[in-house]
């Protein structure tokens, strides 16, 4: 479930709250969270390996040549700069976001967040020009999408949902918007994974625990890879409307479940 929903613009948090609530599952803990973040990172790097490779080696080559106008070096630099807003916001709000009794973690907030993002994504889909490519991106574009990542700190928004919406709003083609979103999100996903890995030092896993963690990482990586593949196919051939509809319905189901007592 987490592997599939982590990288889709449909909020993995909403799914990982509603399914355990319905089935009575317990919180899987930091080991599970670390595995999911690392799985997401592995999936994005493997799917967009051509872009990642070009950015890495192109930037290194540009540095040796001192060619700071090189397109690979510029994009890599912008990706780093675009990560700063969510790092600052994450550190500043960590006390509120990580508190067990934080109102932001309630199913009510998650439900309304799903609906709000469905509306914003719908507006982006309706009014966007869908003409630009990553080759036409600017520093301002990268920073705006980077700022949009802050929305991911609110449960129910989803990082891919907020950044895809921002990129579409800036006029990028649908598939290019998703590609831009994932590449810009690599440092944020990596930092989140490192944070969860740091939490693992508090967990004393035995051999069985590590084997379960490794299995979960592999399965989640594969499912996340195919989730990206599916997202790109939908955006290339159709539009973002399937995700708009799904998000909206998910938010309504969450709020109805709370009102009627299915969820708590």
Curated annotation (Swiss-Prot):
The chain crosses the membrane at residues 29-49, 77-97, 107-127, 137-157, 180-200, 212-232, 243-263. It holds the Pfam family BacA. It is found in: Cell inner membrane. It is an enzyme of class 3 (hydrolase). It catalyses: di-trans,octa-cis-undecaprenyl diphosphate + H2O = di-trans,octa-cis-undecaprenyl phosphate + phosphate + H(+). Bacitracin is thought to be involved in the inhibition of peptidoglycan synthesis by sequestering undecaprenyl diphosphate, thereby reducing the pool of lipid carrier available. It is a multi-pass membrane protein. Keywords: Antibiotic resistance, Cell inner membrane, Cell membrane, Cell shape, Cell wall biogenesis/degradation, Hydrolase, Membrane, Peptidoglycan synthesis, Transmembrane, Transmembrane helix. It comes from the Bacteria. One of its GO terms (cellular component) is plasma membrane. Its EC number is 3.6.1.27. This is Undecaprenyl-diphosphatase 2. Its main location: membrane. Catalyzes the dephosphorylation of undecaprenyl diphosphate (UPP). Confers resistance to bacitracin. Belongs to the UppP family. The lineage of its organism: Bacteria, Pseudomonadati, Pseudomonadota, Alphaproteobacteria, Hyphomicrobiales. It comes from Mesorhizobium japonicum (strain LMG 29417 / CECT 9101 / MAFF 303099) (Mesorhizobium loti (strain MAFF 303099)). One of its GO terms (biological process) is response to antibiotic. One of its GO terms (molecular function) is undecaprenyl-diphosphatase activity.
